[in-house]
A protein has these predicted regions:
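Hydrophobic beta-strand segments of well-ordered beta-sheets in folded domains
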Residues: 7, 31-34, 96-100
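Conserved catalytic core of nucleotide-sugar-dependent glycosyltransferases
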Residues: 15-90
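Histidine (H) residue identity feature
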Residues: 41, 53, 63, 111, ...
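Short, well-ordered beta-to-alpha junction loops that form the rim of enzyme active sites
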Residues: 11-12, 19, 103-105
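Short beta-strand-to-loop acidic/aromatic patch adjacent to the donor-nucleotide binding site
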Residues: 4-15
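C-terminal, non-catalytic tails of nucleotide-sugar-dependent glycosyltransferases
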Residues: 94, 98-102, 124-186
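Catalytic core and acceptor-binding pocket of nucleotide-sugar-dependent glycosyltransferases
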Residues: 65-140
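Short, conserved alpha-helix that lines the donor NDP-sugar binding/gating region
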Residues: 1
């Protein structure tokens, strides 16, 4: 690997939906790190608390070769989030860096967290490799009195339907257009 090579980390249930080479080249001229923005937590509604999420992280190889980023990528920080990727926050702060946050750009939201498009570049299913209950679902259950297990079952059913569409060569474009607000479901 060369120092100026771009390293891209991508979750197993995320994939590009548009060319992103030029976008990353441009952003990495200004920012040392490009990442999806962590969705807000129920205990932290501060929109200025931007947490890089590992479903998508891009940076130049020099940060691994000479700047110790590898150690920070696997560091669990003990704060209100206790996440294993929290070390990136420390890495950014210690160096005075800011990152470019990819933000959710869906126009149609089937769920407040799942089935997300970020900056019209990346699709993230969010439910591909974990339990089907989320922070927004727990808030919903608390506010409505619904059973969390019923919400998880509903999430699983919708996830299966969406996954079938995004894994279909004939339907993926329609699904992405729908989530972007460019296509009406019939």
């Amino acid at each position: 690997v060369k120092k100026d090579d771009t390293i891209l980390l991508l979750d197993s249930d995320a994939f590009p939906i548009a060319p992103m080479g030029d976008f990353l080249d441009e952003k990495l001229k200004t920012y040392p790190f490009v990442s999806a923005q962590e969705p807000m937590h129920e205990w932290d509604r501060d929109p200025l608390y931007l947490i890089p999420h590992p479903m998508f992280m891009a940076f130049k190889a020099i940060h691994i070769l000479e700047d110790n980023l590898t150690d920070y990528l696997r560091e669990i920080i003990k704060d209100k989030n206790d996440n294993w990727w929290g070390g990136t926050i420390n890495w950014l702060k210690e160096r005075g860096y800011y990152y470019y946050p990819l933000t959710r750009s869906n126009k149609a939201d089937l769920h407040p967290l799942y089935y997300a498009i970020y900056d019209d570049l990346i699709y993230h299913h969010w439910a591909g490799s974990r339990n089907m209950i989320t922070r927004p679902d727990r808030i919903r259950a608390q506010e409505t009195g619904e059973n969390v297990d019923d919400i998880a079952k509903e999430n699983h059913e919708v996830s299966s339907q969406v996954f079938e569409r995004v894994s279909s060569e004939t339907d993926i474009d329609n699904m992405m257009a729908y989530l972007k607000g460019e296509y009406e479901e019939s």
